[in-house]
Amino acid sequence: MLPRGLKMAPRGKRLSSTPLEILFFLNGWYNATYFLLELFIFLYKGVLLPYPTANLVLDVVMLLLYLGIEVIRLFFGTKGNLCQRKMPLSISVALTFPSAMMASYYLLLQTYVLRLEAIMNGILLFFCGSELLLEVLTLAAFSRI
C-alpha cells in the first residue's frame, strides 16, 4: 500500500533513463579516481611548489566539501531515476550547479593549476553538463505521467 498521494508508474511503462544511469555509474567511478588523484596532486603541490599553507588547506577542505556534494548528487540522481521520482532527481539537478561551480574553481581559480587538473576538471564539467541535460529530459518524461 502506497502512502496517500503517491502513485506508481503504470504497469509496463518504464520512464527511467538508461543513458542517464550509465552516466551516473561512470561519473561515480570517475569521481573516485578524481578525488584520489587530486589529493595526490595537492600533496605534490604542497611539497614541491611554494604553495601558501592557508590556500592549500582551503583547497583541500573545498575538495572534501566537493566530494560530499558529488556523493549526495549522484545518490539522489540515481535514486530519482531508478524509482521514477521527481523530487530526488530535482535535488540532483539543484546540486549540479554547485558541483559545476566547484569544478570550475579547480579548473580556473586555484593558486596553481596543473595541466592534468585542467583535463580532469574539463571531463568533470562535461559529465555535469551531460547529466544536467539528461536529468531535465528525464524530469520532463516523469512529468507526463
Curated annotation (Swiss-Prot):
One of its GO terms (biological process) is non-motile cilium assembly. GO terms for cellular component: ciliary transition zone; cilium; cytoskeleton; cytosol; membrane; MKS complex. Keywords: Cell projection, Ciliopathy, Cilium biogenesis/degradation, Cytoplasm, Cytoskeleton, Disease variant, Joubert syndrome, Meckel syndrome, Membrane, Retinitis pigmentosa, Transmembrane, Transmembrane helix. InterPro entries: Uncharacterised_TM-17. It is a multi-pass membrane protein. It is found in: Membrane; Cytoplasm, Cytoskeleton, Cilium basal body. It holds the Pfam family Transmemb_17. The chain crosses the membrane at residues 22-42, 56-76, 89-109, 122-142. TMEM138 and TMEM216 genes are adjacent and are aligned in a head-to-tail configuration. They share some cis regulatory region and display coordinated expression. Genes were joined by chromosomal rearrangement at the amphiboan to reptile evolutionary transition around 340 million years ago. It is linked to Joubert syndrome 2: A disorder presenting with cerebellar ataxia, oculomotor apraxia, hypotonia, neonatal breathing abnormalities and psychomotor delay. Neuroradiologically, it is characterized by cerebellar vermian hypoplasia/aplasia, thickened and reoriented superior cerebellar peduncles, and an abnormally large interpeduncular fossa, giving the appearance of a molar tooth on transaxial slices (molar tooth sign). Additional variable features include retinal dystrophy and renal disease. Part of the tectonic-like complex (also named B9 complex). Interacts with TMEM107. Part of the tectonic-like complex which is required for tissue-specific ciliogenesis and may regulate ciliary membrane composition. This is Transmembrane protein 216. The lineage of its organism: Eukaryota, Metazoa, Chordata, Craniata, Vertebrata.
